[in-house]
């Protein structure tokens, strides 16, 4: 009976490890996709800049996840997906607004949500806030965000 239980436990551990590797590979694939989009000269500059932010945010997540012992691949996958969804929703909401003041309100709401919810509490604000006050990007969000 012990052997049977140990076999089941071992099988579950192996399955969990495969899932973790699959999640990590998916996040790396997401990064490769946005990097390709970022470097695609047939895309307009705004699309490429949004892809640049996504690329940097995914790189930041992967890097910080590797440095944080209790940060699992599952959490990495959740954060990566949430970041992509957050940015896509922001771009969609921004495109729906016609007046500059309404666009500014959307930007302020999303920017404040990003800055108010750090994930890693990274003290390096020069890196984490690199996009926050950069007028050249519509994605003025903190990289250290609990998406």
Annotated model-derived regions:
Residues 74-147:
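Surface-exposed, polar helix/loop patches in the mature regions of secreted/periplasmic/lumenal proteins
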């Amino acid at each position: 009976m012990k052997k049977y239980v140990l076999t089941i436990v071992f099988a579950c551990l192996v399955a969990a490890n495969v899932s973790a590797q699959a999640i990590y590979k998916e996040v790396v694939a997401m990064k490769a996709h946005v990097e390709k989009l970022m470097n695609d000269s047939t895309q307009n500059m705004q699309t490429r800049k949004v892809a640049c932010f996504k690329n940097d945010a995914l790189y930041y997540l992967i890097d910080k996840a590797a440095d944080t012992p209790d940060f699992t691949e599952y959490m990495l996958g959740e954060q990566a997906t949430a970041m992509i969804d957050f940015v896509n929703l922001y771009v969609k909401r921004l495109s729906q607004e016609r007046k500059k003041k309404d666009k500014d309100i959307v930007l302020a709401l999303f920017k404040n949500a990003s800055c108010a919810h750090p994930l890693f509490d990274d003290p390096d604000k020069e890196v984490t806030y690199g996009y926050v006050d950069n007028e050249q990007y519509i994605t003025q969000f903190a990289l250290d965000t609990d998406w």
